[in-house]
């Protein structure tokens, strides 16, 4: 009897690993029609419901206040959201997968690579390697974990039309992977405006609920905001829209444990302080994007094909720099 209970507990533990399908709520006494309404509104996992504020559920047609409270109460039972000891949290952190960048020096700087379950922002001028790093990561995330990969698919949202599948094939060849398999494992979408960019995240959520993804790339997260909103009069609306987009990205990272990589552009500082600054460029998006990204990397040009990556902001990495190179087969180490 005790053994049976032990196996049941193990099975439950296994089921609780990773995102749980929204249909799980039906077993908790939630009406199937209500579950369907949640799914139609973009909630594909129990985690998505548990992390959502009640106000968001009340916006769904046919969900009353009483229903919303019951749904949230049941979701909270399935998703651990209370306090935990720092020991347990430390244990969970030690199991986080890092995705290799293709450059040993860069991986050493990042203490393993791009962290899953959080947002990494890369910013810099044009030709500093942002898009090339994204292309390399879209392949390395498919590698087995013992080879510095994430054993999952990649999702690529392109806002500037700079995605090139032939770059992925060159990187795949370097790692001895089948080119056609690598391309099949990358879901690509071109975003045409800021609303479309946000809409694509709802589709991303549905796809992640069905298949194992390790990485979500948005290149560039801010380019369309610079054109869709102009002047100071629209600044407040732009920042609110951007904040909502970044919040959705963070929720996807929390919900599915994917690594989210966003690229950002820089703007020249034209105020009085610019003449005293060593480098008068700063990332756009202001404080909103600064607070949303967990790790911020500043990329700049070196000599020839070499580039320099600096940790600009991170909760646990020291401020340091590393050199890498952009080669024909993706990002690699700089040759001395």
Curated annotation (Swiss-Prot):
GO molecular-function terms, A-Z: ATP binding; ATP hydrolysis activity; ATP-dependent activity, acting on DNA; ATP-dependent DNA damage sensor activity; DNA strand exchange activity; double-stranded DNA binding; single-stranded DNA binding; single-stranded DNA helicase activity
A cellular-component GO term for this protein: nucleus
Keyword presence, Flavoprotein: no
Motif Nuclear export signal: where in chain: 242-257
Gene3D superfamilies: 5' to 3' exonuclease, C-terminal subdomain, P-loop containing nucleotide triphosphate hydrolases
Keyword Acyltransferase set for record: no
Major localization listed first in the record, in broad terms: nucleus
Location of the protein in the cell: Nucleus; Cytoplasm; Chromosome
SMART domains: AAA (SM00382)
Family per record: Belongs to the RecA family. RAD51 subfamily.
NCBIfam families from the UniProt entry: PRK04301.1, recomb_RAD51
Name the record gives this protein: DNA repair protein RAD51 homolog B
Originating organism: Xenopus laevis
Organism lineage string: Eukaryota, Metazoa, Chordata, Craniata, Vertebrata
């Amino acid at each position: 009897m005790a053994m049976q209970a032990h196996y049941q507990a193990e099975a439950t533990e296994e089921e609780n690993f990773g995102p749980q399908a929204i249909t799980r709520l039906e077993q908790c006494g939630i009406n199937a029609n209500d579950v369907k309404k949640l799914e139609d509104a973009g909630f594909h996992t129990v985690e998505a419901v548990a992390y959502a504020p009640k106000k968001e559920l009340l916006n769904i047609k046919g969900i009353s206040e009483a229903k919303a409270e019951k749904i949230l109460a049941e979701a909270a039972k399935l998703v651990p959201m209370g306090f935990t000891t720092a020991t347990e949290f430390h244990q969970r952190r030690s199991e986080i997968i890092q995705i290799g960048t293709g450059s040993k020096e860069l991986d050493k700087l990042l203490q393993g690579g791009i962290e899953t379950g959080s947002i990494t922002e890369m910013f810099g001028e044009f030709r500093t390697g942002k898009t090339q790093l994204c292309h390399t990561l879209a392949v390395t995330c498919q590698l087995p974990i013992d080879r510095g990969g994430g054993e999952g698919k990649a999702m690529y949202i392109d806002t500037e039309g700079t995605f090139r599948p032939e770059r992925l094939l060159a990187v795949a060849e370097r790692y001895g992977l089948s080119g056609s398999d690598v391309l099949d494992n990358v879901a690509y979408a071109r975003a045409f405006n800021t609303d479309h960019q946000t809409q694509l995240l709802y589709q991303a959520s549905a796809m992640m609920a069905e298949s194992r993804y390790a990485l979500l790339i948005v290149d560039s997260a801010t380019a369309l905001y610079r054109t869709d909103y102009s002047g100071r009069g629209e600044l407040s609306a732009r920042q609110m829209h951007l904040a909502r987009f970044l919040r959705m990205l963070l929720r996807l990272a929390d919900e599915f444990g994917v690594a989210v990589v966003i690229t950002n552009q820089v703007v020249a500082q034209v105020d009085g302080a610019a003449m005293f600054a060593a480098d008068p460029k700063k990332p756009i998006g202001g404080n909103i994007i600064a607070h949303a990204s967990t790790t911020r990397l500043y990329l700049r040009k070196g000599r020839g094909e070499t580039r320099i990556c600096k940790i600009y902001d991170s909760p646990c990495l020291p401020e340091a720099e590393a050199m890498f190179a952009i080669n024909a087969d993706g990002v690699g180490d700089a040759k001395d």
